[in-house]
Every structure is written in structure tokens, then in C-alpha cells.
């Protein structure tokens, strides 16, 4: 698909354009193979530690119907699949009389089963003994019908996809361990903050369809790389969701979970008892930037300078875009960086004024505009800050990617230590590992002076 120039595109409203897709579908196949090979290469497999590969945001329905079989093939080594209903939801129009539509299109027995299951959960929540802040559910018939009419077409397609995943694994694996996989249901694409009632209905629907959900991802109002400002409010939101999830045996997935405060993570871990997943994909190119910024290698420094300049140019272009969303977001990114450095934020009278303000800042991977735009540099043809150059899967784009593959051992060591240190930070603050164990791990990481020593330590 890529070599034939047939990649689909993905909208990125904050940059006002579409970019050829790079992470959904068949690309999962290559990444999962790479992960398996890396474990064998480093000797990690000799430790006998179970690990999981997540096929993130696998698209259900919509324009992906025609590619479904290829998507299934791409996920056979994924032990953990996230179902993303948004492509089908985007083309679903709810009938004016949602209840009548449901009566005509949804099996009556299934609706009765779902309502009974939600009522059962609600009754258990009414009994607040042993439960933090009793949060009884209130199932409104009209709201139930509207939600069901909205999600039913996508859930039917999710069930069909799930059956195909199971069949593909049954064909290729001979053991129960190989055939098994975890399911995550992403519902943070539904409008607004997710209510406990919505979570209960979605979990009950999947349960009734024979799809055990191991993780569910509600919307908590998170923004990537930004701490949640109110820990008391966050605790309340999570407690209400956890009371429902616990009844279904599901853990909570925290999407846009990177860059939160230690206190935020402590709340997540305390409320769920460690039954959680934190999506950290927004963190990794940031940590690469920090690694190159700190490297003394001349080639690493040259890549860092080009990378930073690229984000500056996109920020300035975006700040004066005719697209309202792109302009708004670019200005938010710029003013955040300026205000955190103690600078004035009235800088949008002209592109020249904006450029002068940004260039007065010392280059840093901590600036929000760098964090938000940096991932686009990896496949920008020629490293150009132009919309036509973004997400380039031709040789020009891969020559740009090769610059990242060619970073020095010092840069690689910095990157590996940054990622590992971040994971230790998460493990400690969510309570997944004792503080003493985490402190030992941090000390060990700090002691690695060469990449070779770190890699050799993986198999020990």
C-alpha cells in the first residue's frame, strides 16, 4: 500500500490539513514483528517476563470496511487490541425517533439483557457499603435509546471484526496463550466527558455480544502532556467510573495519559488499585528531543537544531493560518511557551513580531509548540515545514526518517534512559511497584555510561 502510493490520509485539525496515515492498520504488522525481534536480539526473552504488544486504535467501520481483512492480518501478533469505533460513528446519523429505530433494528432480547445488567450494576452501586462515594446509576430511557441508536451499527461491525481476529489467531496459533488477546474499548471519542451510565451501557453491550472488555477508556478531559489541574475533581471522576468498571471486571485505560503530575498518577493508581493502563504515545518523541538536546554529539545537535527550527516554522505558519482551528491552537502553543518563560504574550500583530518573540526563547524541548509539532518532523520530506511535505512515505520521507535511525550511541543511551526513567516514575506513582524497587532501578539506570552496557544489562 505504502510503496504503491495508496496510503489513506488522516485529518489533523490542529495543523489544518490531512497527513498520510502512519500508525493504523497494516503498519501494526511491521511494528509487532520489530518488537518480537528486538526482544530476541537483546535477550529479553531469557528473563521469562510476559509482555504485551498493543495494536492501538484499530479503526472499525467507515472507510476501513474495505481494508478489514488486511487490518486483521496486521494484528495477529498483537496481544492487546484497542477498538476505535469513531470511523463508523462519524457516518452514523441517529434517527429522530431513536426508540423506534432501536425497536426495529436491535434484538429485543439483547436490549433487555443490557438494561438488566446496567440495573444490576446500578443496584450494587446504591449499596454504598465498602464502596467509595456511592454513585448509583440513573438509566434514562430516552438517553439509552439515543446512545444505542448511535453505537449499534459500529458495535455490530466491532463484533464482526472481533470474530475475524479470533479466527485468524485460531488458524496461526496452537495454544490457548497464543490465541488469547485482550480487548480495549475506546469510548473517549464519544461526545463530552463520559458518564458512568454510558460506560455501563457500553460494557454491558459488549458483554451481551460475547466480547469481554479488559480495558475501557472513558473521556476524563485529559490533554496530552498537561497535568490535570484538580486532583480532588479527578479522584471523583475516576471513582465514579471505577465503581462501574469493577463490576464488569474491566480496568481503566487513561488515554492522553502522558505528561500528568505525580499526584495525578497517584490518584489513578489509588482509586483503581493498579488496574489501569496509561497511554503514553505522546511522550516518546518528546523524550527523543530531550535526548538529542542533551547529547554532545555534533550530528545529534545538528538534528536537534533542525527539529526545533521545524516546529518554530510550523508554529508561525499556524498562528496566521486562515483555518480558525489551526490558528487558535498554534497561538495557544506559542503563548504557553512564552508565558512559562515569563515573556509577554501579545505577540500576534504580525508574523515578524511572533518570530521575534519565539526566537527570544532559548531552544528547548519543553516548549509546548515543540511538543505538539515535533512528531511531524520524522517523515517530513527534506525536513521541510510545509504541509505538502508532511507524512511523506516516498524515499524523500524515509531519508528524513533515516536521520533519526542514525543518531549516535550517546543519543540512543539518553533516549533509552529517558524512557525507562519515565516508566519507573509511572510504576512508582501508580503503585504498580514499591518505591524501594523503583529507587534501585533509577540508580541502576543512572549508572549506565554506555549504550552497550545498558543493552547487555537487559539479558542479565
PLM region descriptions:
Residues 80, 84-165:
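Active-site cores of enzymes that catalyze phosphoryl transfer or operate on phosphate-rich substrates
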Residues 1-38, 43-46, 50, 61-87, ...:
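Active-site capping/gating regions of soluble enzymes
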Residues 186-190:
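Short loop/turn motifs enriched for small/polar and acidic residues
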Residues 177-183:
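Short, conserved phosphate-binding/catalytic loop or strand-edge motifs used
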Residues 56, 185, 255:
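Conserved, mostly hydrophobic/aromatic
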Amino acid at each position: 500500500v505504502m510503496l504503491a502510493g495508496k496510503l489513506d490520509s488522516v485529518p489533523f485539525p490542529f495543523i489544518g490539513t490531512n497527513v498520510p496515515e502512519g500508525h493504523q492498520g497494516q503498519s501494526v504488522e511491521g511494528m509487532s514483528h520489530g518488537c518480537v525481534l528486538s526482544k530476541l536480539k537483546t535477550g529479553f526473552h531469557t528473563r521469562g517476563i510476559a509482555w504485551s504488544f498493543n495494536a492501538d486504535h484499530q479503526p472499525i467501520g467507515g472507510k476501513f470496511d474495505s481494508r478489514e481483512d488486511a487490518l486483521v492480518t496486521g494484528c495477529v501478533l498483537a496481544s492487546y487490541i484497542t477498538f476505535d469505533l469513531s470511523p463508523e460513528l462519524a457516518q452514523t446519523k441517529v434517527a429522530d425517533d431513536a426508540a423506534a429505530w432501536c425497536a426495529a433494528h436491535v434484538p429485543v432480547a439483547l436490549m433487555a439483557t443490557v438494561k438488566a445488567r446496567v440495573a444490576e450494576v446500578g443496584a450494587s452501586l446504591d449499596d454504598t457499603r465498602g464502596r467509595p462515594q456511592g454513585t448509583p446509576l440513573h438509566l434514562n430511557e430516552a438517553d439509552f435509546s439515543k446512545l444505542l441508536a448511535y453505537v449499534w451499527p459500529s458495535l455490530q461491525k466491532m463484533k464482526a471484526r472481533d470474530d475475524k481476529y479470533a479466527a485468524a489467531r485460531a488458524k496461526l496459533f496452537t495454544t490457548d496463550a497464543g490465541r488469547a488477546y485482550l480487548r480495549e474499548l475506546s469510548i473517549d471519542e464519544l461526545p463530552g466527558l463520559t458518564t458512568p451510565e454510558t460506560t455501563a451501557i457500553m460494557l454491558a453491550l459488549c458483554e451481551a455480544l460475547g466480547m469481554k472488555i479488559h480495558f475501557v477508556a472513558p473521556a476524563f478531559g485529559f490533554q496530552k502532556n498537561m497535568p490535570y489541574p484538580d486532583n480532588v475533581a479527578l479522584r471523583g471522576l475516576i471513582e465514579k467510573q471505577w465503581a462501574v468498571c469493577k463490576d464488569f471486571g474491566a480496568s481503566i485505560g487513561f488515554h492522553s495519559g502522558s505528561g500528568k503530575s505525580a499526584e495525578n498518577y497517584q490518584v489513578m493508581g489509588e482509586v483503581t488499585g493498579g488496574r489501569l493502563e496509561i497511554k503514553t504515545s505522546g511522550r516518546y518523541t518528546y523524550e527523543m528531543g530531550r535526548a538529542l538536546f542533551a547529547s554532545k554529539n555534533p550530528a545529534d545537535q545538528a538534528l536537534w537544531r533542525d527539529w526545533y527550527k521545524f516546529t518554530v516554522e510550523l508554529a508561525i505558519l499556524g498562528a496566521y493560518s486562515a483555518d480558525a482551528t489551526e490558528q487558535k491552537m498554534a497561538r495557544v502553543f506559542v503563548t504557553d511557551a512564552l508565558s512559562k518563560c515569563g515573556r509577554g504574550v501579545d505577540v500576534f500583530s504580525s508574523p515578524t513580531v511572533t518570530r521575534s518573540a519565539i526566537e527570544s526563547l532559548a531552544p528547548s524541548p519543553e516548549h509546548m509548540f515543540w511538543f505538539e509539532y515535533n512528531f511531524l518532523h520524522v517523515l517530513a520530506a527534506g525536513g521541510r515545514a510545509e504541509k505538502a511535505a508532511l507524512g511523506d512515505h516516498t524515499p524523500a520521507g524515509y531519508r528524513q526518517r533515516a536521520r533519526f535511525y542514525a543518531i549516535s550511541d550517546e543519543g540512543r543511551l539518553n533516549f533509552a534512559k529517558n524512557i525507562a526513567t519515565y516508566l519507573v516514575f509511572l510504576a512508582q506513582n501508580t503503585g504498580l511497584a514499591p518505591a524501594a524497587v523503583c529507587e534501585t532501578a533509577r540508580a541502576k539506570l543512572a549508572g549506565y555510561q554506555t549504550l552497550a552496557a545498558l543493552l547487555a544489562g537487559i539479558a542479565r
